[in-house]
Amino acid sequence: MTYGNVYVAQIAMGSSDAHTVRALQEAEAFDGPSLIIAFSHCIAHGYELNEGPDHQKAAVNSGYWPLFRYNPAKASKGENPFSLDSKAPTIPIDEYLASEGRFKVVNDQSKATGEAAPAEGSVLANVRHDVNARWNLYEQLSKGWRLA
Protein backbone atom coordinates (compact mmCIF):
# COMPACT_ATOMS: atom_id res chain seq x y z
CA MET A 1 0.00 0.00 0.00
CA THR A 2 2.92 2.32 0.56
CA TYR A 3 3.79 2.09 -3.13
CA GLY A 4 0.37 3.45 -3.97
CA ASN A 5 -0.01 1.49 -7.20
CA VAL A 6 -0.83 -2.04 -5.98
CA TYR A 7 -4.31 -3.32 -5.15
CA VAL A 8 -4.18 -4.96 -1.70
CA ALA A 9 -6.93 -6.71 0.23
CA GLN A 10 -7.02 -8.79 3.39
CA ILE A 11 -9.83 -11.35 3.40
CA ALA A 12 -11.25 -14.19 5.49
CA MET A 13 -13.64 -16.31 3.44
CA GLY A 14 -15.24 -17.84 6.53
CA SER A 15 -15.95 -14.42 7.97
CA SER A 16 -17.53 -12.67 4.99
CA ASP A 17 -18.23 -14.24 1.62
CA ALA A 18 -19.42 -10.90 0.25
CA HIS A 19 -16.18 -9.15 1.23
CA THR A 20 -14.13 -11.95 -0.30
CA VAL A 21 -16.00 -11.82 -3.62
CA ARG A 22 -15.86 -7.99 -3.75
CA ALA A 23 -12.10 -8.00 -3.08
CA LEU A 24 -11.41 -10.67 -5.70
CA GLN A 25 -13.52 -8.85 -8.30
CA GLU A 26 -11.79 -5.53 -7.60
CA ALA A 27 -8.36 -7.18 -7.71
CA GLU A 28 -9.13 -8.75 -11.07
CA ALA A 29 -10.48 -5.48 -12.48
CA PHE A 30 -7.52 -3.40 -11.26
CA ASP A 31 -5.12 -2.40 -14.04
CA GLY A 32 -1.90 -3.35 -12.29
CA PRO A 33 -0.55 -5.75 -9.71
CA SER A 34 -2.93 -7.09 -7.06
CA LEU A 35 -2.25 -8.82 -3.76
CA ILE A 36 -4.87 -10.73 -1.78
CA ILE A 37 -3.86 -11.77 1.75
CA ALA A 38 -6.21 -14.57 2.78
CA PHE A 39 -6.75 -16.12 6.20
CA SER A 40 -6.54 -19.86 5.69
CA HIS A 41 -7.17 -22.24 8.54
CA CYS A 42 -5.31 -25.52 8.84
CA ILE A 43 -5.07 -28.47 11.21
CA ALA A 44 -1.90 -27.00 12.76
CA HIS A 45 -4.01 -24.18 14.24
CA GLY A 46 -5.22 -26.70 16.81
CA TYR A 47 -8.93 -27.09 16.10
CA GLU A 48 -11.20 -29.19 13.91
CA LEU A 49 -11.24 -27.95 10.32
CA ASN A 50 -15.05 -27.89 10.24
CA GLU A 51 -14.76 -25.10 12.84
CA GLY A 52 -12.66 -23.01 10.45
CA PRO A 53 -15.31 -20.45 9.49
CA ASP A 54 -16.10 -19.80 13.17
CA HIS A 55 -12.42 -19.26 13.92
CA GLN A 56 -12.08 -16.91 10.95
CA LYS A 57 -15.01 -14.87 12.28
CA ALA A 58 -13.37 -14.80 15.71
CA ALA A 59 -10.06 -13.67 14.18
CA VAL A 60 -11.86 -10.78 12.48
CA ASN A 61 -14.03 -9.93 15.49
CA SER A 62 -11.01 -9.85 17.82
CA GLY A 63 -9.08 -7.48 15.56
CA TYR A 64 -6.41 -10.11 14.90
CA TRP A 65 -7.38 -10.22 11.20
CA PRO A 66 -9.11 -7.01 10.05
CA LEU A 67 -10.75 -7.04 6.64
CA PHE A 68 -9.71 -4.24 4.30
CA ARG A 69 -9.27 -3.24 0.68
CA TYR A 70 -6.80 -0.76 -0.79
CA ASN A 71 -7.74 0.23 -4.34
CA PRO A 72 -5.41 2.81 -5.96
CA ALA A 73 -7.98 3.38 -8.74
CA LYS A 74 -10.16 5.18 -6.18
CA ALA A 75 -7.41 7.72 -5.47
CA SER A 76 -7.37 8.80 -9.12
CA LYS A 77 -11.09 9.62 -8.72
CA GLY A 78 -10.43 11.69 -5.61
CA GLU A 79 -11.78 8.97 -3.30
CA ASN A 80 -10.10 7.35 -0.31
CA PRO A 81 -8.36 4.23 -1.65
CA PHE A 82 -8.49 2.45 1.73
CA SER A 83 -11.65 0.72 2.97
CA LEU A 84 -11.71 -0.85 6.44
CA ASP A 85 -14.44 -3.43 5.98
CA SER A 86 -14.62 -4.99 9.43
CA LYS A 87 -16.03 -3.40 12.55
CA ALA A 88 -14.02 -2.48 15.63
CA PRO A 89 -13.06 -5.54 17.70
CA THR A 90 -15.96 -6.98 19.69
CA ILE A 91 -14.21 -9.86 21.46
CA PRO A 92 -10.99 -9.70 23.49
CA ILE A 93 -7.87 -10.86 21.68
CA ASP A 94 -7.16 -13.14 24.68
CA GLU A 95 -10.41 -15.01 24.00
CA TYR A 96 -9.48 -15.56 20.36
CA LEU A 97 -5.95 -16.70 21.20
CA ALA A 98 -7.27 -19.13 23.84
CA SER A 99 -9.49 -20.79 21.22
CA GLU A 100 -6.56 -21.97 19.08
CA GLY A 101 -3.93 -24.52 20.03
CA ARG A 102 -1.25 -22.73 18.00
CA PHE A 103 -1.26 -19.96 20.60
CA LYS A 104 -0.87 -22.36 23.54
CA VAL A 105 2.51 -20.91 24.54
CA VAL A 106 0.98 -17.43 24.76
CA ASN A 107 -1.84 -18.68 26.96
CA ASP A 108 0.47 -20.82 29.11
CA GLN A 109 2.83 -17.90 29.70
CA SER A 110 -0.10 -15.71 30.72
CA LYS A 111 -1.43 -18.33 33.16
CA ALA A 112 2.03 -18.98 34.62
CA THR A 113 2.35 -15.41 35.87
CA GLY A 114 -0.95 -15.69 37.75
CA GLU A 115 -1.66 -12.03 37.09
CA ALA A 116 -5.06 -10.75 36.02
CA ALA A 117 -3.42 -8.62 33.33
CA PRO A 118 -0.42 -9.76 31.29
CA ALA A 119 2.89 -8.31 32.40
CA GLU A 120 4.35 -5.58 30.22
CA GLY A 121 6.71 -7.15 27.71
CA SER A 122 4.95 -10.52 27.82
CA VAL A 123 3.93 -12.14 24.56
CA LEU A 124 0.24 -11.54 25.30
CA ALA A 125 0.82 -7.88 26.16
CA ASN A 126 2.79 -7.46 22.92
CA VAL A 127 0.04 -9.14 20.88
CA ARG A 128 -2.58 -6.88 22.47
CA HIS A 129 -0.45 -3.84 21.69
CA ASP A 130 0.15 -4.91 18.08
CA VAL A 131 -3.55 -5.65 17.46
CA ASN A 132 -4.57 -2.27 18.88
CA ALA A 133 -1.85 -0.37 17.00
CA ARG A 134 -2.72 -2.03 13.70
CA TRP A 135 -6.44 -1.37 14.21
CA ASN A 136 -5.75 2.29 15.01
CA LEU A 137 -3.60 2.65 11.88
CA TYR A 138 -6.25 1.08 9.66
CA GLU A 139 -8.94 3.26 11.23
CA GLN A 140 -6.88 6.37 10.44
CA LEU A 141 -6.34 5.18 6.86
CA SER A 142 -10.08 4.65 6.47
CA LYS A 143 -10.59 8.30 7.46
CA GLY A 144 -8.28 9.52 4.71
CA TRP A 145 -4.86 9.56 6.37
CA ARG A 146 -2.12 8.68 3.83
CA LEU A 147 0.82 6.31 4.26
CA ALA A 148 3.03 8.15 1.80
Task: Give names to the regions the model predicted.
Residues M1-G4:
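Phosphate/pyrophosphate-binding betaalpha-module
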Residues Y7-A12:
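Short catalytic-loop micro-motif centered on adjacent basic/acidic residues
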